[in-house]
C-alpha cells in the first residue's frame, strides 16, 4: 500500500544503488570464502542462517538489545493516540508501539516491512518533549517505515555483520587454535583480510545511505505534519540532552546508532563525517528551516 508520505526518488535511487553494490560485494565475498575454505555448503548454511535471523527477527533483536517492550493503549494512551493519528494521516498500517526504559532521549523504527514494523521511544524522550515535538519525532520514524529504508538498512547491514563475525572467528582460531600448519595459517590470514576489506567497504556504503535517509525522513515528517519547527525543536532538545547522558550509558546504545532519531555519539568534524550515521545537526536544522519558509510556517512565539 502506498502511503501519503511524499515519495523520495533520490532516496529510492540511493537505496537501489547501495543494494546493487553490496550485492556485487556479497557475491564476490561468498565466492572468495568458498574458494578459500573449500566448503561451499558450510559457507552457504552460515550465510543463510545469519541473514534469515537478521531479516526476520530484526525487530525483536533491536527491542531486546535496547530493553524495549511492546506497550498497550491502556498503558500509554497519549503515545498510541499520536501514532494512530500519524498512521491515519499517512494512510499506512499502524506499527507496533514499544517503549524502552532508558534515560537517553531517543526513538527508532525497525521491522522488515510496513505490515511488520515497530516504533519504539524511550521514557527519557517522553519526559522531555512537548506533544508537537513528539509528533514530529514519531512522523520521522514512521517515514522510515513507509519509505522501506528500515528494511534496506537491515538487509544492507547483513554483509557487514557476516564479515565482522568471520574476522573475529579467524582471529580467535589463530589465537586459541593450537598448532597449525603454514597453509592453514595462510588461509586464515587471507580470510581475515578479505573479510576486513568487505566489512570496511560495506560500512562506508551503509553510512552514506544512512545519512541521506535521515534527511529524507526529516523532510517527509515536516511535510506530513506541516510543522518543521516542532521537529527542529525536538532535534535541538534531544541532541543537547544526549550530550549530558553519562558516556557509559550511551555506549550500550551506540551499536544501534543508524536506527536512532539522533545518534548516541556525534561524529567528529572532518573525515569523521564519512563514518557518521547521521548528518550534522546544522544540516538537519538548515533543511527544516528551508521547509518552514516554503510552507510559510508562522514563527514560534518569541522567535519572530
Curated annotation (Swiss-Prot):
Regions annotated as coiled coil: none
Active site: residue positions: 141
One Pfam family hit: Peptidase_M48
Cofactor note: Binds 1 zinc ion per subunit.
Keywords of this entry: Cell membrane, Hydrolase, Membrane, Metal-binding, Metalloprotease, Protease, Transmembrane, Transmembrane helix, Zinc
EC number from the UniProt entry: 3.4.24.-
Membrane topology note: Multi-pass membrane protein
Protein name as annotated: Protease HtpX homolog 1
UniProt similarity note: Belongs to the peptidase M48B family.
InterPro entries xrefs: HtpX_protease, Pept_M48_protease_HtpX, Peptidase_M48
Cofactor(s) listed: Zn(2+)
Transmembrane segments: 17-37, 39-59, 151-171, 186-206
Subcellular location field: Cell membrane
Gene Ontology molecular-function annotations: metalloendopeptidase activity; zinc ion binding
Top-level lineage group: Bacteria
GO BP terms, alphabetized: proteolysis
PANTHER family: PROTEASE HTPX, PROTEASE HTPX HOMOLOG
Binding site for Zn(2+): 140, 144, 214
Gene name of the record: htpX1
Record-level GO cellular component terms: plasma membrane
